[in-house]
Amino acid sequence: MFSKIKGTYDLMSDKMVCWQKVENHIRTLFAKYHLQEIRTPIIEYRGVFDRAAQHSEMVSKETYTFADKKERFITLRPEGTAGVIRSYVENKLDKTSQLHKFFYYGPCFRYERPQKGRYRQFHQVGVEILGQSNPFLDVEVIALAYETIKSLGICDITVKINSLGCKTTYNNYLQVFKNYLQAHYQQLCPLCQERFEKNILRIWDCKNCNNEPFLKQAPRIFDHLVEDAKVRFLQVLEGLKQMNVNFELCHDLVRGLDYYTHSVFEIVYNNEQGHQAVLGGGGCYDNLVTLFGGNPSPGIGFALGMERLMSILATHSFCNKNILPSLDAFILVSVPQFFYQGLALATTLRHQGFSADLNYQFLSFSKSLKQALKQQPLYLLILGPKEFDNNQITIKNTDTQQQTTILQKDVVSYFQNNKELN
């Protein structure tokens, strides 16, 4: 017997229905923001992710990469942005003056230690808006990420936000930060000593070093923003206030990928025990398109982790109300000889927009009835010898227990005129 791979899981029954409900809710919300869905391959050449985050630990340590039969290195996507940017450039959208607003949804893969809310195959839903850069767009995108989560009934959330400034700010600060940490190099943990050489800002993320006094006293990037970048960031903060977004300025927030500029943010959930869980995050990336060989084209985006969202929603009313999709009609066929007449009825109802099912085994009436009612149909349609001989069907309301017998040709009009089904 085979078992599922560590860090993966199966979705079925109630959980699957809840996932679909959340997915459909998010798609409907994104459509209201005039976002267009984009679907990129699950597999890309390794260089796509190397280009997007060459110093990231995600690329160096966590990706599933393999050589194909022609010795080309292929990577299962660990995140959604890089594939969208590759597609944007490959399809020459960077050469248009149009603002492109995308959303994506699908599985991603990272080889990391499985834990609660974190898997080796996981799902991201994300937004990427390409072609413009200004504080107003930052505000709407951050507010959208915030609204997406709140609209699911998860209200105790906070946006943590920082600015990495423009390229000039970023490069200047890297040198200031490095010079400061040089004197504390021996106090860094082994991982942060490695980060010191390759991706120094990730030291801010370290759980071991983050509480050390020397890091708490380190220079803050906010204090080194050039004037234009500071004005822009203050406009973003003011905009978030006007949009009633609950946010917190977080000077040590840098995000895990090294292509970000200007506004970066994470959305955290504050549970009843006082613990926080990161549900998603994102930021601006003014220079990412040029790294892929495209024309300068700034962008901003975010991604939310579906598994984290679903683990919280499991205890919320969003997934507990009407969790199972309703079945309008179950046609109970008493004997095999009547099956195709029952199937024809089910097909007719389906063509008219009603959900219908029927039995494929023919047990005693009491056993068949018991199995039919387990499907929780709104109406039970009984096709027995009497009904068959007279081209009739007996319809029973499973809630009120009232029943009536009508001609089979009138079934559709009966359902169309029934308020419970419309």
Curated annotation (Swiss-Prot):
It is found in: Cytoplasm. SUPFAM superfamilies: Class II aaRS ABD-related, Class II aaRS and biotin synthetases. It is an enzyme of class 6 (ligase). The keyword Cytoplasm applies. GO terms for molecular function: ATP binding; histidine-tRNA ligase activity. The keyword Nucleotide-binding applies. It comes from the Bacteria. Its EC number is 6.1.1.21. Keywords: Aminoacyl-tRNA synthetase, ATP-binding, Cytoplasm, Ligase, Nucleotide-binding, Protein biosynthesis. GO terms for biological process: histidyl-tRNA aminoacylation. PROSITE patterns: AA_TRNA_LIGASE_II. GO terms for cellular component: cytoplasm. Belongs to the class-II aminoacyl-tRNA synthetase family. This is Histidine--tRNA ligase. The lineage of its organism: Bacteria, Bacillati, Mycoplasmatota, Mollicutes, Acholeplasmatales.
